[in-house]
Amino acid sequence: MTNIRKTHPLMKIINHSFIDLPTPSNISTWWNFGSLLGLCLTIQILTGLFLAMHYTPDTVTAFSSVTHICRDVNYGWLIRYIHANSASMFFICLFLHVGRGLYYGSYIYFETWNIGIILLFVVMATAFMGYVLPWGQMSFWGATVITNLLSAIPYIGTTLVEWIWGGFSVDKATLTRFFAFHFILPFIITALVMIHLLFLHETGSNNPSGLVSDSDKIPFHPYYTIKDILGALLLILVLMILVLFSPDLLGDPDNYTPANPLSTPPHIKPEWYFLFAYAILRSIPNKLGGVLALVSSILILLIFPLLHLSKQRSMMFRPLSQLMFWVLVADLLTLTWIGGQPVEYPFITIGQLASILYFTIILLILPAVSLIENKLLKW
């Protein structure tokens, strides 16, 4: 008798996706982050669901309801901090996952890559709206500043901002709709993840060498299921150390002050995972220019397949490209640091130089270095 997992319509899909999936035998730990992102999404949906049971999306009671969750709800403090810090873990995994894709040339599977970038955008939007919900000072002012950027769009900008706000300022209507969107988007993300996997399984996984690995495939289970479980345990370990020992390490102390439209915090800044883009935004002294640079800093990922001029897919055997890749990583870390600093000398200059370097490496240096490597290898 044939195994049920190979005949049952539903089990067959699961079997082809997670059990009998032919997988390259040499994929490294850098390929673990896909499953870790799935774990983060699951944690976020579950903890978010329980938080939504006690949260009230109203300007008068939002802050108090979060306090109530932390003080009165059974293990509410734990659920809240797991939710807040899992968001950080989510973005750490996202950045490493995208970085892996850039390093090993995974963007050559452009359908999978493009869906991945759409996912990145939607996750960023979800995280931004979630940050507004506790209705602390940084929630309110972050929402005001970031949504106000849309007013830079010519002609329709101001109308668009007021339409998003549901009034003439960030208020009850804004909070209510942000809560609604924050609730629905993770399910849209889940659907996009399924499409992401669908396209990935059309081609099969890339591998560190960037070479075709059809001649050397192994089943996903048990080899990579065990490997993914190890990764998941390590992620949960790091997350729980963060949650139980320093839950506010990555948050902003200003968010423990209830939102006050009459008092502006000295330094308005988003969560740490948006700081690199925020630094690029601030480095341009023109509003529309800044917004375009901000959007371009993420959208530029879409043109990586077009900028790939090397004859080799992966950077594994390309030392010059490797060097430039790590310079790009260092540049992004510099931008993240600058994004959290006040707007004054020397931070303004460092931010501008780092922003220029970011776009120069991607648009000019990496393609040029690829051509040099082709020449050196006489290809």
From Swiss-Prot:
Ligand binding (heme b b562): H83, H182
Record note on cofactor: Binds 2 heme b groups non-covalently.
Organism: Spermophilus variegatus
Cofactor(s) annotated in UniProt: heme b
Segments passing through the bilayer: 33-53, 77-98, 113-133, 178-198, 226-246, 288-308, 320-340, 347-367
Gene Ontology MF terms: metal ion binding; ubiquinol-cytochrome-c reductase activity
InterPro entries associated with the record: Cyt_b/b6_C, Cyt_b/b6_C_sf, Cyt_b/b6_N, Cytb/b6-like_sf, Cytochrome_b, Cytochrome_b_C_euk/bac, Cytochrome_b_N_euk/bac, Di-haem_cyt_TM
Protein name: Cytochrome b
Domain of life according to the entry: Eukaryota
Note: Heme 1 (or BL or b562) is low-potential and absorbs at about 562 nm, and heme 2 (or BH or b566) is high-potential and absorbs at about 566 nm.
Membership in a protein family: Belongs to the cytochrome b family.
A single GO BP: mitochondrial electron transport, ubiquinol to cytochrome c
One GO CC annotation: respiratory chain complex III
Membrane topology: Multi-pass membrane protein
Localization per record: Mitochondrion inner membrane
Keywords: Electron transport, Heme, Iron, Membrane, Metal-binding, Mitochondrion, Mitochondrion inner membrane, Respiratory chain, Transmembrane, Transmembrane helix, Transport, Ubiquinone
Subunit annotation: The cytochrome bc1 complex contains 11 subunits: 3 respiratory subunits (MT-CYB, CYC1 and UQCRFS1), 2 core proteins (UQCRC1 and UQCRC2) and 6 low-molecular weight proteins (UQCRH/QCR6, UQCRB/QCR7, UQCRQ/QCR8, UQCR10/QCR9, UQCR11/QCR10 and a cleavage product of UQCRFS1). This cytochrome bc1 complex then forms a dimer.
Biological function: Component of the ubiquinol-cytochrome c reductase complex (complex III or cytochrome b-c1 complex) that is part of the mitochondrial respiratory chain. The b-c1 complex mediates electron transfer from ubiquinol to cytochrome c. Contributes to the generation of a proton gradient across the mitochondrial membrane that is then used for ATP synthesis.
Binding site for a ubiquinone: H201
Binding of heme b b566, residues: H97, H196
